[in-house]
Amino acid sequence: MPRVISIVSGKGGVGKTTLVGNLGAILSKKFDKKVLLIDANITTPHLGQYMGVDFCQTTLNDVLRGKALVDEALYEHESGARLIPASIELHDLKGIDISKLKKVVAEANKKIKDTEIVLIDSAPGLGREAVASLKASKEVLFITTPYAPIVIDVMKCARIAEHLKLKPLGVVVNMSHGKGHELNKQEIEALVGLPVISTIRHHKEVHHSLSARKPLVLHRPRTQGAKEFYRLAEALMGVEQTNPGVLARLREIFNRFYSTTPKNTKKMQAQ
């Protein structure tokens, strides 16, 4: 059975979609994992746009309404990751029953038999969309910025995940500037009750990748921000990080000599 991981935040704008896109690209392209990304933020979806897959004919909305099969809403990204986007059209919110998300995820795992990891880009907060993502998952990774109001919201999300008996993977602190007015690692861990497994600093290159509609690890793989996403992916996969300097040099060599020309994004059917 594949790992099903929801990426959860208590507030929008903390980098949840950016995290999902970059992790998906790394796990697929570098770890050779069969990865499925699902945009479960139905009301304000961004994952498809971030990955360069938008204005799709068939989306998760159609599947939730029972008007399409799950494999009909499946698209392949240039990284090799598969993606089920949500519709950006306002009228496509009609007739959506988000409580069916768990059933859709189960159906996707049944039809796409080689999937190893499912990453769900959940809606922020504690509403029905966010809870539906949690209920469809087995594991949960929390993301926050280093400020008390947002960390407190994550604390609430963590309590719901605990109630649902989900496996917590820890907390990612995003957009850190390393300033004294920010909460530090120990303070965040004390509030949430979970370990901080990664701190990703604020990098302007992330904004460039947003404009390019491409994950940072593909758009600018040698940047410090990309390296931080790599280290997080390694932690999630249980890779030892005893000598990150060597890993960084190996990646640089790989990127220099073995980088490939991106494929066009294409729609695919389940195999």
What are these regions (language model features)?
Residues 36, 103, 107-111, 117-208, ...:
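Conserved catalytic-core segment of NTP-binding enzymes
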Residues 20, 97, 101, 150, ...:
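Short, conserved glycine- and acidic-residue-centered signature motifs
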Residues 163-271:
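C-terminal lobe/tail of nucleotide-utilizing enzymes
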Residues 37-111, 210-212:
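P-loop/Walker-type NTP enzyme "switch/lid" segment
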Residues 1-3, 31-33, 78-79, 113-115, ...:
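Short coil/turn connectors at secondary-structure junctions
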Residues 12, 39, 63, 84, ...:
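Residue-level signature of catalytic and energy-coupling elements of molecular machines
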Residues 25, 45, 61-62, 72, ...:
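Solvent-exposed alpha-helical segments within well-ordered globular domains of core cellular machineries
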